[in-house]
C-alpha cells in the first residue's frame, strides 16, 4: 500500500469512528420505553444545543460561549460565569428529570424553574454542600440536602415536579422536599454557569395539564 492510499484509509477510519461515537452518544440519550409511555420527551439530542439558548438569545445559538459545549453526548460546562443555558420554550406545569455529575470536588451550578428568558430566578441550588436550597425566589419547604448527592465523578439524577405553586424535588430516587408558594405561573428552564466544571445528560420533560 502506497503512502497516499494509507493516508486515505486512515482518514476513512477516523470518519467512521467519529460517526460511531456520535451514534453511540445519541443512543445513550434516547428515551426508554417507560419514559415514552409516561409522556416524557428529550430536551437534549446528544449532538448540539437545539432547543436551548444563552441569555435569551437565538435558538439554536449561532455562536457558543467558551464555557459551554456538547461533547461525547454530554452537555459540558467548563466553569466561568454567564451566560447561563436556558430552554427556548417556556413551561407551566411539568415534570423534569436529568442527570449531572461534578468533574471536580468544589462544584457549583443550579437548576432554574419558571425563570425569565435570561434565566436567573427560581433556582434549585447545585453547589457543593448546599444542594437543594432554593435561591432567587420564595417558597416554603425547600432545604439543603447534600447528604443525598453522590461523590464527584458519579452521576446524580434530579427530578422536579412543578404543579401550580407546588414544587416537589427528588435526588437519586429519594424525596428531598416538597415546597409551596412558587409565585411565577410560567417560565423557562435553565442550567447555571457558576465557575465550576460539570456535565449533564438525559434531560427529559413532560408537560402536565393543570388537573395532573
Predicted stretch roles:
Residues 27-212:
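Carbohydrate-interacting regions of secretory-pathway proteins
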Residues 12-24:
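Bacterial N-terminal signal peptides
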Residues 8, 12-13, 205:
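Positively charged, low-complexity intrinsically disordered regions
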Amino acid at each position: 500500500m502506497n503512502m497516499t492510499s494509507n493516508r486515505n484509509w486512515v482518514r476513512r477510519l477516523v470518519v467512521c469512528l467519529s460517526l460511531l461515537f456520535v451514534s453511540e452518544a445519541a443512543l445513550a440519550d434516547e428515551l426508554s420505553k417507560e419514559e415514552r409511555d409516561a409522556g416524557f420527551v428529550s430536551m437534549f439530542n446528544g449532538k448540539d444545543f437545539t432547543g436551548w439558548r444563552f441569555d435569551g438569545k437565538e435558538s439554536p445559538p449561532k455562536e457558543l460561549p467558551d464555557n459551554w459545549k456538547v461533547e461525547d453526548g454530554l452537555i459540558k460546562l467548563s466553569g466561568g460565569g454567564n451566560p447561563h443555558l436556558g430552554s427556548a420554550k417556556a413551561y407551566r406545569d411539568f415534570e423534569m428529570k436529568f442527570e449531572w455529575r461534578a468533574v471536580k470536588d468544589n462544584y457549583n451550578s443550579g437548576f432554574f424553574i419558571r425563570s425569565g428568558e435570561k434565566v436567573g430566578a427560581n433556582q434549585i441550588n447545585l453547589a457543593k454542600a448546599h444542594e437543594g436550597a432554593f435561591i432567587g425566589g420564595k417558597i416554603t419547604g425547600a432545604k439543603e440536602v447534600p447528604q443525598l448527592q453522590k461523590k464527584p465523578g458519579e452521576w446524580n439524577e434530579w427530578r422536579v415536579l412543578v404543579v401550580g405553586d407546588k414544587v416537589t424535588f427528588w435526588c437519586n430516587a429519594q424525596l428531598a422536599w416538597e415546597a409551596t408558594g412558587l409565585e411565577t405561573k410560567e417560565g423557562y428552564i435553565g442550567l447555571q454557569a457558576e465557575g465550576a466544571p460539570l456535565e449533564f445528560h438525559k434531560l427529559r420533560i413532560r408537560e402536565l395539564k393543570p388537573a395532573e
